[in-house]
């Protein structure tokens, strides 16, 4: 019997694929086409956003991708519609899909990707989910300054000098997931934001950077009696609201001076240790505490020469309305630690950086390397929001006990201080910032009662210029910040910084933004009157490097 029309072509294709000689370009082309269709949001059979099949099957594959961009698959809830089923809704209307599952992560980066349930037991407690994501931040910065900061390095000028640059600020790849309803894990590496250097100024290996280094690398167990969620591994310790907020959602290109001087000065804010987090059932009161290694490099998890560090944070949310669109948050945090190798260096870069940390970024204030027996820190947080307006402020204080000056490093880059080896007692440094933001397009920020920080902003209309889509221009956010750092205390004076940063953020989608910053910093700084020589420290003139520094920056940032 003769084949119906078209059957001969289908059989030819079947023979092509069954013969083992199918061309590689065909598979590659189909993969590229599928990826392109998913990226632009076109409905693809079996992918979120397509109409349900006539005979729904248990999903095995991608259940959701970038947060806010693609809807999750609808789980099959009924058999295939029969001829007696009611007709589908008219036009393009479809019944609402269920909300994506709640997923606890370090920065709400992406929604889960399901690889399948346990095929043997069918038990939800053994369901495994995995997420794959990353982020890229590309910066362009330019600077200008008055005479003082532009003096030579050995005459109290900025060290290193200012330099314009186009560079990657961060480039990370991340894989995290959950096993059952109690265990979750994360691993993330940054390929652009690390320099292999010691606290003592000089690099361990010259010209070694940027280097890939771990940020998140931890395992967490939830629902532990009394302790709540217990996390073990490389992580952020619970100290500081700005510190615990994801770099994906920062209001400015850089965090405050205090983040650089106190919170995460040389380890990028990630330290190895164990922590526990718990709170009331409604989330309005929460606490977190942990024990960590006091590292001085992003590679410190493999170096046991450091001291111990205990950190804790308590948060109270007296006002929480409309998912945090009206909010008042009050927090208090503390650290107590043994200085690594008995040495501490307080320093801060500016409100704009010209790429990854290390020898390319100018140091605005610097105490030099001090010795000490113990260090305590205190932090206070105040966060509020009302509709499109929000604000946050923090204060930090640091006490270094039994401090003394040292001759470690090039003394010419340190601030004014007595001769090396001079005991100076307790050194107290402090700083803080206050910032405010306003959505010009009317959006409001929501707040996570689980992690006690703002969620990722969601534009009302993502950027869409295609005539086949609903026209949208994203969200626009204006921001302003006052920034303060004082590294002056009695005998050891590393400098005083007062800064103002203005920002304009264009949120193209929930996962992509363009950031514009102008930073103005006034620096009060005098160099130390000592220099190293073969015979020991010798007196030299002290220079005045005070002045004003202007910075202009822009960033293209996206994560997936």
Q: Which stretches of residues belong to each language-model region?
A:
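Outer membrane beta-barrel
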Residues: 117-148, 158-340, 428-470, 477-490
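Outer-membrane beta-barrel pore domains
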Residues: 97-104, 144-145, 159-160, 204-207, ...
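Short, aromatic- and cysteine-enriched interfacial helices/patches
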Residues: 13-17, 47, 60-63, 120, ...
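Sensor of tandemly repeated, compositionally biased sequence architecture
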Residues: 9, 21-22, 29, 77-85
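Sec-dependent N-terminal signal peptides
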Residues: 20-47
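Intrinsically disordered and other compositionally biased segments
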Residues: 11-16, 25, 35, 51, ...
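N-terminal secretory signal peptides that target proteins for export/translocation
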Residues: 1-22
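N-terminal periplasmic/intermembrane-space "pro-region" immediately following the signal or transit peptide
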Residues: 2, 38-153, 202-205, 444-466, ...
């Amino acid at each position: 019997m003769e084949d119906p029309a078209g059957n001969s072509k289908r059989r030819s294709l079947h023979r092509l694929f069954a013969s083992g000689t199918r061309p590689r370009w065909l598979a590659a082309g189909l993969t590229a086409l599928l990826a392109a269709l998913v990226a632009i949001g076109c409905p693809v059979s079996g992918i979120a956003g397509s109409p349900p099949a006539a005979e729904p099957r248990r999903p095995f594959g991608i259940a959701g991708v970038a947060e806010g961009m693609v809807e999750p698959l609808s789980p099959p809830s009924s058999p295939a519609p029969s001829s007696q089923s009611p007709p589908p809704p008219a036009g393009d209307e479809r019944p609402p899909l269920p909300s994506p599952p709640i997923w606890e992560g370090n920065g709400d980066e992406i929604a889960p990707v399901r690889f399948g349930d346990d095929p043997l037991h069918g038990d939800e407690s053994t369901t495994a989910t995995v997420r794959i994501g990353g982020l890229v931040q590309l910066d362009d910065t330019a600077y200008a300054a008055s005479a003082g900061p532009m003096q030579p390095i050995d005459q109290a000028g900025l060290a290193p000098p200012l330099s314009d640059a186009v560079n990657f600020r961060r480039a990370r790849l991340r894989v995290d997931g959950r096993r059952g309803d109690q265990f979750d894990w994360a691993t993330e590496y940054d390929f652009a934001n690390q320099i292999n250097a010691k606290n003592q100024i000089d690099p361990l290996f010259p010209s070694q950077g940027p280097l890939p280094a771990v940020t998140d690398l931890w395992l967490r167990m939830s629902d532990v009696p009394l302790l709540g969620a217990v996390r073990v591994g490389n992580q952020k310790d619970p100290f500081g609201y700005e510190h615990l907020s994801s770099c994906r959602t920062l209001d400015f290109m850089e965090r405050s001076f205090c983040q650089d001087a106190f919170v995460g000065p040389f380890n990028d804010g990630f330290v190895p240790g164990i922590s526990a987090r718990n709170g009331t059932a409604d989330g309005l009161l929460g606490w977190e505490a942990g024990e960590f290694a006091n590292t001085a490099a992003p590679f410190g998890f493999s170096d046991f020469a450091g001291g111990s560090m205990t950190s804790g944070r308590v948060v109270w949310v007296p006002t929480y309305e409309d998912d945090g669109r009206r909010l008042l948050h009050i927090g208090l945090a503390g650290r107590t630690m043994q200085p690594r190798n008995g040495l501490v260096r307080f320093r801060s870069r500016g409100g704009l950086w010209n790429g990854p940390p290390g020898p390319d970024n100018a140091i605005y204030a610097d105490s030099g390397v001090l010795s000490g027996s113990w260090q305590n820190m205190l932090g206070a947080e105040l966060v509020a929001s009302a509709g499109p307006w929000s604000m946050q402020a923090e204060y930090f204080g640091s006490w270094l006990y039994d401090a003394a000056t040292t001759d470690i490093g090039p003394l010419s880059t340190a601030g004014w201080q007595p001769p090396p080896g001079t005991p100076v007692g307790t050194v107290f440094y402090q700083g803080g910032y206050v910032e405010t933001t306003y959505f010009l397009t009317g959006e409001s920020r929501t707040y996570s009662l689980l992690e006690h920080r703002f969620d990722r902003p969601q534009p009302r209309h993502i950027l869409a210029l295609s005539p086949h889509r609903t026209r949208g221009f994203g969200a626009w956010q204006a921001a302003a910040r006052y920034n303060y750092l004082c590294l002056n205390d009695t005998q050891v004076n590393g400098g005083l910084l007062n800064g103002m940063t203005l920002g304009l953020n264009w949120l193209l989608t929930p996962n992509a933004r363009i950031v514009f910053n102008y930073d103005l910093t006034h620096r009060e700084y005098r160099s130390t009157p000592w220099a190293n020589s073969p015979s020991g420290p010798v007196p030299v003139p002290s220079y005045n490097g005070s002045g004003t520094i202007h910075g202009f920056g822009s960033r293209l940032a996206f994560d997936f």
